[in-house]
Amino acid sequence: MDIIFYHPTFDTQWWIEALRKAIPQARVRAWKSGDNDSADYALVWHPPVEMLAGRDLKAVFALGAGVDSILSKLQAHPEMLKPSVPLFRLEDTGMGEQMQEYAVSQVLHWFRRFDDYRIQQNSSHWQPLPEYHREDFTIGILGAGVLGSKVAQSLQTWRFPLRCWSRTRKSWPGVQSFAGREELSAFLSQCRVLINLLPNTPETVGIINQQLLEKLPDGAYLLNLARGVHVVEDDLLAALDSGKVKGAMLDVFNREPLPPESPLWQHPRVTITPHVAAITRPAEAVEYISRTIAQLEKGERVCGQVDRARGY
């Protein structure tokens, strides 16, 4: 069994050694331009077209929760990956836990009005504020996949009213489910906090725009943990300036790194982080990949395969 590995920033040698230890029967190598030798599996992140083109692979593993970097290249270079080759993403591998930590900490930050008190501190002003009440602090999760379900579970511990929206209806205990475009407005109408965990597909690009934001209650909050392309940044800034949106926590952006001239850096109602809400944990990723390869070799059914047509 031959495995090729490519990631522009990861510690390649660590990964190769870890994979060799986890899959002793495999010959694992770092892919370099010009390497056309045979391979059974490819582990990749933002791979060059030539790495995958023409290969008879058993499977490709994207080294993250999203596969948009591969699917976008496939649109321009359909020869990059044969339609018969299964494409897998890392469904969790510790990312769910990280998303839970990030989402819960920020929701509580807003719920306890720490954002308002920070503004008071900056102006040396002392004024206790009325508390928010849980029953009026509904949290909506936009995108109800694996990570969305993890976030919902963690927020249930804090007894917030929860709702989710996705392409198809979900049956999560204690979570009100909305499905399809026809139910999006009803979903948004009660969301004091909107958490975006949508996949990046042509249908979801720009979905968080002026029209969507206007359907939220006045003074709502936005937490974007998915992709920057989901948000029309000018529309969000306008909603923040008008007070329609009271605050935003953004981990992802249309351009990354976020350009120094972006007004998001200095906006008093925006907090940003550099795409770190959930990063790939190497040891857990290696365990998932080795387990999945073993299942594939036995012809067993496995989880995490991407539907290329849907984009996730």
Swiss-Prot record:
Kindly list the places in or outside the cell where this protein is found, as annotated in its UniProt entry: Cytoplasm
Might you give the EC number(s) for this enzyme?
1.1.1.79, 1.1.1.81
Q: Does the keyword NAD apply?
A: yes
Q: Which GO terms describe its cellular component?
A: cytosol
Q: CDD domains this protein is in?
A: GDH_like_2 (cd12164)
Q: Which cysteines does the record link by disulfide bonds?
A: none
Which NCBIfam families does the entry mention? PRK15469.1 (NF012013)
> This chain belongs to which protein, by name?
Glyoxylate/hydroxypyruvate reductase A
Highest classification ranks of the organism: Bacteria, Pseudomonadati, Pseudomonadota, Gammaproteobacteria, Enterobacterales
Name the gene behind this protein: ghrA
